[in-house]
């Protein structure tokens, strides 16, 4: 297929977001995380306003040692994280899932980190509410993954709208060895003779052609974009050696504005380089 599109015009149609209503915060995940430690948090609530908080904490710990596991979240850390503190006396590596220091040293952590002050001076009134807010803030770290998922969901919806059926002629997150087995095709040209494990986001099968599809979205710039463009250019070139197989790349995001040179090179040799605007204009109907 000869490339007839104008790169700059195509680039100008990149969208600024793929965020849907639930993109910004995964509230079900937040509620689930809080619910799993709600009892321990309510036990810790008894320390709010304490006049002898160190002594009260030690007494509380003796009866409810599980309260130690909620401490990391009070400073926006996960239980699995080792919390490292550099002290003039020595370095500490606190493990809150399995105690590795004396309880007195953990008490020192709560004192010096400011947690006791938070509780003793009524800076919070309820730790369940407080941790819910912490979880919302920490959930923003998951937006990067949700961006990729959102882009894949968009692409899948367009593929299914064209009549592709998951498990029949549409496959998701499938490795090259599975593709070779299902479709009796040799992909060694793009896998270094089978020495490289390659997984594609989607594969679709038409009457004549098998399409190997990669999907991504970049809202910001960075070296990753150039690496991706170069990598997919190579795959596009290598795929030409495989009969009845085409490589398709569906990407979007205004991060490409600052990484357009490598993208242009791939655009020039890859006829099946699309964005969401292309999908909206029924580009998939043109596939053989």
Curated annotation (Swiss-Prot):
Enzyme Commission code(s) on record: 3.1.21.4
Keywords: Endonuclease, Hydrolase, Nuclease, Restriction system
Protein origin, superkingdom: Bacteria
Any GO MF annotation of the entry: DNA binding
InterPro entries (UniProt xref): Restrct_endonuc_II_DpnII, Restrct_endonuc_II_DpnII-like
Entry keyword Hydrolase: yes
Pfam families with a match to the protein in the record: DpnII
Catalytic activity, reaction form: Endonucleolytic cleavage of DNA to give specific double-stranded fragments with terminal 5'-phosphates
One record GO biological process: DNA restriction-modification system
Subunit structure: Homodimer.
Family: Belongs to the DpnII type II restriction endonuclease family.
Protein name: Type II restriction enzyme DpnII
Phylogenetic classification of the source organism: Bacteria, Bacillati, Bacillota, Bacilli, Lactobacillales
Gene transcribed to yield this protein: dpnB
């Amino acid at each position: 297929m000869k490339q007839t599109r104008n790169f700059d015009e195509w680039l100008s149609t990149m969208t600024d977001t793929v965020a849907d209503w639930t993109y910004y915060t995964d509230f079900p995940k937040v509620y689930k995380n809080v619910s799993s430690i709600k009892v321990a948090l309510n036990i810790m609530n008894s320390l709010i306003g304490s006049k002898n908080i160190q002594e009260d904490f030690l007494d509380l710990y003796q009866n409810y040692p599980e309260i130690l596991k909620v401490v990391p979240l009070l400073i926006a850390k996960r239980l699995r994280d080792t919390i490292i503190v550099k002290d003039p006396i020595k370095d500490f590596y606190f493990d809150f899932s399995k105690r590795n220091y004396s309880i007195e040293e953990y008490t020192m952590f709560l004192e010096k980190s400011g947690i006791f002050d938070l509780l003793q001076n009524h800076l919070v009134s309820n730790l369940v509410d407080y941790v819910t807010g912490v979880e919302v803030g920490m959930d923003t770290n998951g937006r990067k993954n949700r961006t990729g998922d959102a882009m894949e969901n968009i692409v899948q919806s367009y593929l299914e709208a064209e009549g592709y059926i998951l498990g029949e002629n549409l496959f998701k997150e499938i490795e090259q060895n599975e593709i070779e087995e299902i479709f009796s095709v040799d992909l060694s040209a793009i896998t270094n003779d089978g020495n490289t494990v390659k997984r594609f986001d989607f594969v679709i099968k038409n009457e004549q052609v098998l399409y190997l599809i990669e999907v991504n979205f970049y809202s910001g710039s960075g070296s990753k974009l150039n690496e991706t463009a170069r990598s997919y250019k190579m795959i596009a070139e290598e795929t030409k050696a495989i009969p009845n197989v085409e490589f398709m790349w569906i990407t979007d995001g205004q991060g490409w504005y600052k990484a357009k040179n490598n993208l242009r090179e791939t655009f020039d040799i890859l006829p099946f380089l699309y964005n969401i605007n292309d999908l909206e204009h029924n580009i998939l109907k043109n596939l053989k």
